[in-house]
Amino acid sequence: MEEAPLRDLRDLAWFERNLDAGISALHLDDERLIAGDWDGGLHCWDLDGEIQWNIKASNRVSGFAVGGGWLYAVCGRDVVSIELSSGQICWEHELEGSSDLVACTPEGDTILATSSVFDLEMNDFIESTIWRFNSEGELLHQDSIDERPWAISMRKDGVAFLPLSRPRCGMIRATPDELHHTPLPTSSPATCGTIAQSHTVVGHVDGTLTCIDDGMVMDDDTYTNQPGTIESIAATEPGFLVSTVIEQGAVGAGFGGAEGLARSYDEKGKLLWQIETELGRNIEHVMYGPVVNEQASAWFTSWDKRKSIVEVREAIQGMPLFRSESDSRVTSIEGNREYLALGLEDGTLYLIESDLLSRRLSSIEEQKDESHRSDLAEKLRRLRS
């Protein structure tokens, strides 16, 4: 497959903003874009780029959940409730250790947050706590476990599901009153998870993909196991994207091996296409993005500790659309069929919009065609002379 043409994201972006600290979390919906940064700043814009509000939390923002009229954020050691329209902080609660994940019901009346304690001598997480609050900030329940959850999804009734790392691995089912541990088909630790169109997909260290629907583990052949540790998953479109970290010479790595491998599958689990990166370059994020050429785009970001590459292809056909390079690492990405937001370690934020992206890419292609025709005409003139 041909290499994607190199483009500057600034030339393709709907708008660009520059924060004073690296971007650590993003939320994107039909009305707004919210960015959290490493210094605890939270910034909200409408989709035309007009600032709506700015507030300051205690420390690095690691995640968001939106329900009803509230934004819930995990920041440093705290979980914070923010009025979505004004940015006013309604309440905040200090957790034990560092805050990690947050989820809420669609109405925002039940909130679940997780925090973990990291042991420097053991170089591992030794304890996590799962916290349940109501919309007023009242702590309803808390439980501690020996594992760290790596993803969280919550049903409308407030029951949540959290895939775990070692020692038990498996999954926690968190009800309003207690926690229930459930083994998964693999005993491998979870690494990531994503909420798909109607279910949750969990990635594991051994390359397994587990599909969970309403708390039930589905025997679904759609989610093909991968040849290495799952790094990132996207499943908001029919089908899914997945990136893995694989060792040199592993099956599926191609000749000589590849540090990063990303694949696109259709809704039946058929492999559509894949991309590989050279040794030392890891594909850290995959995401479906704005429609181009009447199909969703597929976005991949990779990093080799020196240069970040964003590569964009047609989700179904795999045709390269463009790639962009930067000295700053992509740290967060959120997308849908209309917009895609990219946050970088140096504080740069881009919002990409479907129609503008399509027009800019078409304009570039037309310029290339015109240049090609001019070159041909010049050659013909030389032949005639």
Regions found by a protein language model. Name each.
Residues 1-21, 48-50:
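A short helix->beta-strand "capping" segment at the edge of beta-propeller domains
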Residues 46-49, 83-87, 133-138, 174-177, ...:
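Short loop/turn segments that connect beta-strands within beta-propeller blades
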Residues 74, 120-127, 164-167, 249-259, ...:
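Short, solvent-exposed loop/turn segments at conserved positions within beta-propeller repeat blades
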Residues 21-27, 59-68, 96-107, 145-156, ...:
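Repeated scaffold domains used in trafficking and secretory/extracellular systems
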Residues 39, 77, 116-118, 165-166, ...:
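Residue-level signature of beta-propeller blades and closely related beta-rich strand-turn architectures
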Residues 326-385:
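Blade-level signature of beta-propeller repeat domains, shared across WD40, Kelch, NHL, RCC1
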Residues 13-43, 56-62:
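Beta-strand-rich domains and repeat architectures in extracellular enzymes and scaffolds
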Residues 43, 80-81, 131, 169-172, ...:
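WD40 beta-propeller blade core
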